[in-house]
Amino acid sequence: VLYNSYAKNRGVAAVTLTVENGCFSYDGRHTVLSDISFCASPGEIVAILGKNGSGKTTLLKCSVGLLKWSGGHSFLDGRDVLHIKSRELWSKISYVPQAKSSFGGYTVLDSVLLGFGSSIGIFGKTQKSDVEKALSVLRRLNIENLSYKKCSDLSGG
């Protein structure tokens, strides 16, 4: 979700993530992703659907520069993510991967608040307004009812 309400209130610009002709292979022979293109603009909700092992996580990692595309590029507001310094990149986007063991004790709301980390800072304290904004995101996604449910109690799919 490229949700811009929180960003605007923190003085951070909302961003557009674009992938053009993304291709990826772990071993150079077996293609995992082929010719993937999309544009996610601020305020849009983008769903990536696929079977287990189909490359959804790989797509996200390539999209934000955690893995390098074998072919194609990812752009954040028109700039190749591989040419953006890490500090600047992570001040504009958040990536919260699925990791049930890591999030076992956290609620869904807690995990959404983790995405606010670059604005709050490592030693910063979550404010009431942060919680309200996170709940607003969950409400927008129509999953506010899961806010206080433990992530370990949710389905991985």
PLM features: what roles do these ranges have?
Residues 149-154:
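Conserved ABC ATPase signature
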Residues 49-51:
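The feature captures the beta-strand-to-loop junction immediately N-terminal to the Walker
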Residues 17, 32-35:
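Conserved structural motif at the start of ABC-family nucleotide-binding domains
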Residues 72-80, 89:
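Conserved ABC transporter NBD signature motif
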Residues 64:
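Helix-to-loop junction immediately C-terminal to a conserved catalytic motif
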Residues 17-28, 74:
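Conserved beta1/A-loop at the N-terminus of ABC ATPase nucleotide-binding domains
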Residues 128-146:
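Conserved ABC ATPase "signature" region
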